[in-house]
Amino acid sequence: MNIANVRVDFLGHAGFLFSFRGKNFAIDPYHVSDFVPKVDVILITHGHSDHCSIRDVQKLSKHGTVVLCPVDCQSALLKVKGINMEVVEVGDAIDFGFAKVECVHAYTTSNPRHAKQEGWLGYLAKMGSTIFYFAGDTDYIPEMQHLTGYGKKENNFVVFLPVAGGVVMDVKSAVDVAARLNPTLAIPMSYGSGVYGTERDAQLFVEMCKQNGINAQMLTKI
């Protein structure tokens, strides 16, 4: 789909591809198809293999591709030749020219597999007039409060929220988060790969969002 001149494609599970001003970047690519192009930037949220997939980083990267990741991914990503890996943490901000990226908190309070002390990440990315919030593997957390203002501004504000209950926030919690953040558009993620989350979870998220006056849409995997 196109959002204010930014092309957004679903890579499956929790992965997305953004194309803007002739540049491509991917977030958490996992089991991507052969149709996905090489990218200039890859953002990794944390070290679990369905988010930090070495095979997919190798598949999408080219010489000089920048890979942002938290410290727990560092040793695994050293296996990928030719990339420029940058270890980042919450609060870091990187300006790529075509996109400005900020690292934000992502953790679960209901599941110890994503503990806050791990320092794992979500990302805010601004491209043109649009701010994209990629929540990562998270529950609703207090740190999301500072994002509530984005939905009240003139800028487009698009949020990507997990809908896989038991591991991260479930559908109802994701709808509650979307209501709090008041985005221009809410897009479900973390489903359909067989790891956790189903297409029905994503469909239910969209249905419940619309019942609550929230614009939401599923994307088709490329």
Language-model-derived ranges and their functions:
Residues 1-37, 87-154, 220-222:
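Core dinuclear metal-dependent hydrolase active-site scaffold
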Residues 24-25, 41, 158, 185:
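Short, Asp-centered acidic motifs that coordinate Mg2+ and/or phosphate
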Residues 30-76, 150-160:
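Active-site metal-binding motif and surrounding structural segment of the metallo-beta-lactamase
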Residues 33-34, 48-52, 74-77, 92-95, ...:
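Active-site environment of divalent metal-dependent phosphoester hydrolases
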Residues 55-60, 76-81, 143-147, 173-177:
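A short acidic, amphipathic alpha-helical/loop segment
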Residues 81-96, 175, 179-222:
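Binuclear metal-ion centers of metallo-dependent hydrolases, dominated by the metallo-beta-lactamase
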Residues 125-184, 189-197:
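Metallo-beta-lactamase
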